[in-house]
Amino acid sequence: MDVSVGTDAAFAPSAAKSRRELNNISEVRHFFRTNDVPIYFFGATPFNLLGLDRWVRNFSYITYYDAWDGAHPRVFTPSHKPYQEFESGEEINNWLLTNPEVRAYIDGSTPRGIRPKIAMVFFDAETENICRELGYDLILPPASLREHLDSKIVTTQLGNEAGAPSVPNVLTKVEDWAGLSAAAEKAGLGDELVVQTPYGDSGKTTFFISSEADWRKHSADIVGQEIKVMRRINNRPVAVEAVLTRCGTIVGPFMSELIGYKKLTPSQGGWCGNEMYPEVLTYENRRTATQLVRRLGDRLANEGYRGFFEVDVLVDT
């Protein structure tokens, strides 16, 4: 059986480097189709940027797992992988970066005098050090800035400053059920609450609390840190991805989010997929949401950030 994989960007002709204004999607596509510098995406799988090699010439995936069993011409997976339990995506990527097979693959496919560019979703300060030592360009914001902005508390504060507010909430610290109830009552949040801690996957750091029994169940994960306490709404979850460039914020299409489906995730508040269709938002809601995302992007730019970010748009039905 033949496997058809779109790799048309790999066969596009080279072009001289130049910085010029790109005015539409066609020009953006041409710009990336003539890219001469190898770009490698690192990850457990190629899921996050699947299909980008159709747009970007010299774009390859270096992954721990190979879903194509060697059939995809632009996916590289080391053949020798001793059993190892990873605690995070960062650990997987750092392991791949230091793997001899991976380093040999990059060296063999990168022209002399060219510094390969590295992209990934999960990285940390160790990743930066490894890339620096190997002579790779990690084309991402500094890990310290990303960690700072990854806090749900910080992004809530920045959103408020930018005029892109969240669901009614209060940022606070609580030590017991009485403290949580008092903070929620003072903020007018009602009796059904959603509590988030600053860092971590939404499914593991989002807690639905409407009784003291709920509090006892989750308190060990909440006490001792600043939290975001929100009014629980009848939410239709929507997500949008945007890119902050030197020319401003480009907002992508709005997608519905799949949250908490038991067959797909063990977590009540856990993300488990997206769907995209025209009626995700009404025209007015889409226009308003686009403006709010751009405001947040402008505020992130003031922090020195540039690159991709994702925003959850909560629609109270």
Report each predicted region and the residues it spans.
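Glycine-rich phosphate-binding loop of ATP-grasp-fold ATP-dependent ligases
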Residues: P168-N169, E192-R216, P237-A239, Y261-L281
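Short, flexible loop/turn elements at secondary-structure junctions
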Residues: F122, K173, Y199, R231-I233, ...
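A short glycine-rich, hydrophobically flanked beta-strand micro-motif that places a catalytic Asp/Glu
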Residues: E241, G304-D316
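Conserved ATP-binding module of the ATP-grasp superfamily
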Residues: P165-V167, G188-V194, F208-A239, R295-N302
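A conserved helix-loop-beta module that forms one wall/lid of the active-site cleft
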Residues: R132-T205
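ATP-dependent carboxylate/phosphate-activation module, predominantly the ATP-grasp catalytic core
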Residues: N234, A242-L300, T317
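Short helix/loop capping segments that flank catalytic or ligand/cofactor-binding pockets
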Residues: L50-G51, E128-N129, I139-P141, S202-T205, ...
